[in-house]
Amino acid sequence: MRCVQCGHLEDKVIDSRMSKDGTTIRRRRVCLRCDYRYTTYEQIERTELRVVKRDNLREALNREKILRGLVKACEKRPVSMDRLDRAVEEIISELHRDHLREVPSSEIGKKVIEKLYAIDPVAYIRYVSVYRQFSNVEEFIQEITQMRHQTLIDPLQRKLPIL
């Protein structure tokens, strides 16, 4: 690797560490000419997923767009950015695992909904209300009722307050 200080092409790796999630390797290097130390990171390069929109247009999968949706849904909720970043990484990993080149936008929406359901019930309702284009209060009530029913069926789910 080319030294950023002197441009020499020979270096030596003096330390390698894997990230907590196992997707990145951090390497400390030293230039064999000038002894300058620097850090490099290795990541697996995934093929770019394309999102197929409702109107059949295609665009590159945008991590930031997914994160923005999560952040908006979790606004003023006790959810950390680290948790949202992890959720985005999980969503993207699942999409790469399940799809080779293209993924329908509806599939991304479903994954986001699943993650939000587990993270925060209020954020989930916010996101679902926009995603499914709720037009009246009855739709909110119906969704909350379904959530409550699901919680009763699955005791491992978070308990929601009774309205």
UniProtKB/Swiss-Prot annotation:
Binds 1 zinc ion. Its cofactor is Zn(2+). The keyword Zinc-finger applies. A zinc finger (unnamed) spans 3-34. Keywords: ATP-binding, DNA-binding, Metal-binding, Nucleotide-binding, Repressor, Transcription, Transcription regulation, Zinc, Zinc-finger. One of its GO terms (molecular function) is ATP binding. Residues 49-139 form the ATP-cone domain. InterPro entries: ATP-cone_dom (IPR005144), NrdR-like_N (IPR055173), RNR_NrdR-like (IPR003796). It comes from the Bacteria. It holds the Pfam family Zn_ribbon_NrdR. PROSITE patterns: ATP_CONE. GO terms for biological process: negative regulation of DNA-templated transcription. Belongs to the NrdR family. Negatively regulates transcription of bacterial ribonucleotide reductase nrd genes and operons by binding to NrdR-boxes. This is Transcriptional repressor NrdR.
